[in-house]
Design a protein with these regions (language model features):
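Feature marks short, highly hydrophobic, charge-poor N-terminal signal-anchor/signal peptide-like helices
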Residues: 1-6
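Glycine-/small-residue-biased sites that favor an extended, beta-strand-like backbone
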Residues: 7-157
Length: 157
């Protein structure tokens, strides 16, 4: 085999290795990015749970404040807050509304957490398919490189 053929086969081998290595790294990086995206989605979902609980706590605090104001207002008007049925019905309705609001706020947080989990799964799926695709292309690069080296060898060897 001539020096030219040996050099060409060597360059083809080096090129094949570089392409293979590059494609394998591409798959690893895609998987790493997917893991990062998934963890960010889960973090955002957990934050939504906290936000929902905070909104619910704020709503209860608002309800408590409103109740104190209402009691003071009715007492100022001379109405007996403890024995007046219409006032108690009003308070019960306000309490029911406040606690229904808090349930909705908490449920909204859990719904958003569920959506975040789906986004995390989707990110991991994208990463896995990108990695698999890169692995297939890397294997193809080795096969194509070996074929090219064999052609060069048979032509110039």
């Amino acid at each position: 085999m001539s020096f030219l053929a040996a050099g060409m086969v060597g360059l083809q081998g080096l090129g094949t290795f570089m392409k293979y290595s590059s494609l394998k790294r591409e798959g690893q990086y895609a998987m790493g990015a997917a893991q990062f995206d998934a963890s960010q989605a889960m973090f955002a979902g957990a934050q939504e749970i906290i936000n929902g609980e905070t909104r619910a706590n704020d709503r209860i605090a608002q309800f408590d404040s409103d109740m104190e104001s209402n009691i003071a207002l009715f007492a100022f008007k001379g109405r007996d807050v403890d024995s007046d049925a219409s006032i108690n019905a009003f308070f019960d309705k306000q309490k029911n509304i406040a606690y229904t609001d808090t349930s909705l706020m908490a449920n909204d947080g859990y719904i958003k957490l569920g959506q975040a989990k789906l986004r995390a799964k989707q990110a991991m799926y994208r990463g896995a398919t990108a990695k698999a695709s890169a692995d297939y292309r890397a294997t193809s690069a080795i096969i194509n490189g070996a074929f090219g080296m064999a052609q060069t060898w048979s032509t110039f060897g």
